Amino acid sequence: MDVVEFRPTPDQFAWTFGGVAPTHRITPGTALRLWTEDAFSGRLQRTTDRPSEVLVMTEVNPQTGPFYVEGAEPGDTLAIHIADLRPARDWAASTTIPFFGALTGTDRTALLQEPLPERTWIYQLDRAAGTVRYEAKNLSLDLPIAPMLGTVGVAPAGREVRTSLVPDTFGGDMDTPEMRAGTTCYLGVNVPGALFSVGDGHYRQGEGESCGTAVEGAMDVTLVVDLVKGGAPAWPRLEHDDDFAVVGSSRPLEDAWRASQVGMVTWLGELYGLDPLDAYQLLTQISRSPLANVVDVNYSAVTLVDKALLPPAQAYGGIHAHLRSVAKGLL
């Protein structure tokens, strides 16, 4: 198995999906050991830092990549297995940004109100305990870390170039806590080589990412990348040992939810030979629907189905179990 290590310098970050030359060409089955910068490009370091003063808004959500996967063609399915996610710093940051977040007026939800005050929180990491420290004026809490990647995506179709702040059919900034170690992410390939990137590490995040920023931190990332010929899903699919999941992204929020639901109806049909109405009925009785983000240009919703409620099925020929086995040798 080939193993590629890459720690990008600031001039090597990608800020978009599409429109960026690949940093590496890899073959299916390659393992990647990567470093990702936090969503703020490391610029928020103190509680006195104000986003309007220290952030460059064209340089947020830096991505590591893109990677060109040999043999990947439009219509294929890229399988990205997250083997390991480890905080790369002993601190992380979260903040309120003017006109950004679920509970404030924004450029798209215009309200006659002033922006919320800017405030920055710095979370100190206790590696031994596996916690981050939330500090407020009247409360301090140690919260368990739950590392995840906010952003995983491929180049969009139709020569589109999309900012790394947008989730859509190509993946992107989905911000779902389901994108964690042990997850295999299936993305439809839109361009030769797929051109996938990852980034936006979170040390933990609640469902919905309400204020718009999680516990944002640099991350050491280990992936195994493989390719399935054909079978491209319309929306990103995730597989854990315990669940199947589909992520839909759109506005309004109910359309993001609908996209994830329709995506799961389609997947259940593929896995079990169900017609759409039978799959629709089954989905109605067994699915769970956590929110991923309600703050980005598109919102993201997740539809999850517990494998324990279903007969055994091998999605994409059982590639999740294969990649999980391969990943064990990297840890």
What are these regions (language model features)?
Residues 39-50, 85-96, 193-203, 292-295:
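Short, Lys/Arg- and Gly-enriched loop/turn segments at beta-strand edges
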